[in-house]
Amino acid sequence: MSVSAAQKTALAWVETARDVLSADCARIFEFAEPAWREYRSSAWYVERLRAEGFTVEDGSGGMPTAFCAEWSNGAGPVVGMYAEYDAVPGNCQA
């Protein structure tokens, strides 16, 4: 299977950002906020995304912990993501 130039670029970026991405995941894990109360996590993500140049709508859909982030560099592919990061009581993260 051949790897396209775009795939090589994406893989190189992930490799370069690996430590930062890992630290970001650890930070959210450490907040360990239960469902509907992810206030610190949400605020951290919103700040982080804005620092990276995203336009962020916080409080999306009337939910204080929900947000929608958007970034564009022109026409091209669109990537959508959805994340659940609440801690579940009784499991290792809560």
Model-derived features: where do they sit?
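Acidic/His- and Gly-rich active-site-bordering loop/insert found
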Residues: 3-94
